[in-house]
Amino acid sequence: MASGREIKSKIKSVQNTRKVTRALEMVSASKIRKAQEQMKISRPYAQAMKQMIGHLAQANTEYLHPFLIAHKQVKRIGYIVISSDRGLAGGLNNNLFRKMLGEMHQWQDNGAEVDIVTIGQKASVFFRRIKVNILGSVTHLGDTPRLEQLIGVIKVMLDAYTEEKLDRVYLVYNHFINTMVQKASFDQLLPLLAAKDKVAHHDWDYLYEPDAATVLEHVMTRYIESLVYQAMLENIASEHAARMVAMKAASDNANKLIGTLQLVYNKARQAAITQEISEIVGGAAAV
């Protein structure tokens, strides 16, 4: 059995770790509220844009934007993968990467190749390690990212699709459902899909000023950017929620471990006292 001093040292070490996990839990709880507010503010805009683009996809126009054109053969797939920069978030990133690898292998089994861009340090490190072709990467955007910081990697994928170097583009991120549940999501970005609402079967006629090509070029690009930005906010909220839950679990486990070690310490101390008493009694008897 370990000595009382060793057990006391272990208890002190676990207590120090518990202080860290409790602090991280409190910080994440504070940050998640802000992340949820940012997410809620941007959602209506993204949803309205999605509905409008869905209608434009079915509109009667002589100009058909490249983002609306589905390629005949799917030989190369692009993914925009969003992860966190930091760890200590439970299985949030690993679950996303595991599902991503499953999707990639399905396409590769069908003869398609895969290119990705990564947003977040964890995704960049993971996919570089397994030798996936990375077209672009951006990291360390913080808890309040700006759209301008994402435009570069988004443009890489949009240009590749326009030039027919990619046949489909997907957005991969953690969708925030609630504090306890975050779901790995795969949304098709390109080609853009038609609206699925109850009016989707109508033909929509639009008047474009100055012309359809100019308007659609700006609208389509802005729409894709808004989707990626919204996904980024969803992922940030998911990260803080997962970290808060993980740190609470770590704190709870620390409490249990401290209780167990304290019990071991008490038994060791009791055994030592019993031993000393036995020695004293034995010595007195010998005298």
Curated annotation (Swiss-Prot):
Q: Name one GO molecular function term.
A: ATP binding
SUPFAM superfamilies the record matches: ATP synthase (F1-ATPase), gamma subunit (SSF52943)
Give GO terms for biological process: proton motive force-driven plasma membrane ATP synthesis
Q: Mind listing the UniProt keywords for this protein, alphabetically?
A: ATP synthesis, Cell inner membrane, Cell membrane, CF(1), Hydrogen ion transport, Ion transport, Membrane, Transport
According to its UniProt record, where is this protein mainly located? membrane
Q: Does Cell inner membrane show up as a keyword for this record?
A: yes
Gene Ontology cellular-component annotations: plasma membrane; proton-transporting ATP synthase complex
Question: Do you know which InterPro entries this protein is assigned to?
Answer: ATP_synth_F1_ATPase_gsu, ATP_synth_F1_gsu, ATP_synth_F1_gsu_CS
Q: Where in the cell is it found?
A: Cell inner membrane
How does the record say this protein sits in the membrane?
Peripheral membrane protein
Q: Is the Transmembrane keyword given for this protein? A: no
Family stated for the protein in its record: Belongs to the ATPase gamma chain family.
Provide the assembly information.
F-type ATPases have 2 components, CF(1) - the catalytic core - and CF(0) - the membrane proton channel. CF(1) has five subunits: alpha(3), beta(3), gamma(1), delta(1), epsilon(1). CF(0) has three main subunits: a, b and c.
Biological role stated in the UniProt entry: Produces ATP from ADP in the presence of a proton gradient across the membrane. The gamma chain is believed to be important in regulating ATPase activity and the flow of protons through the CF(0) complex.
Q: What is this protein called?
A: ATP synthase gamma chain
**What species does this protein belong to?**
Xylella fastidiosa (strain Temecula1 / ATCC 700964)
Organism ancestry: Bacteria, Pseudomonadati, Pseudomonadota, Gammaproteobacteria, Lysobacterales
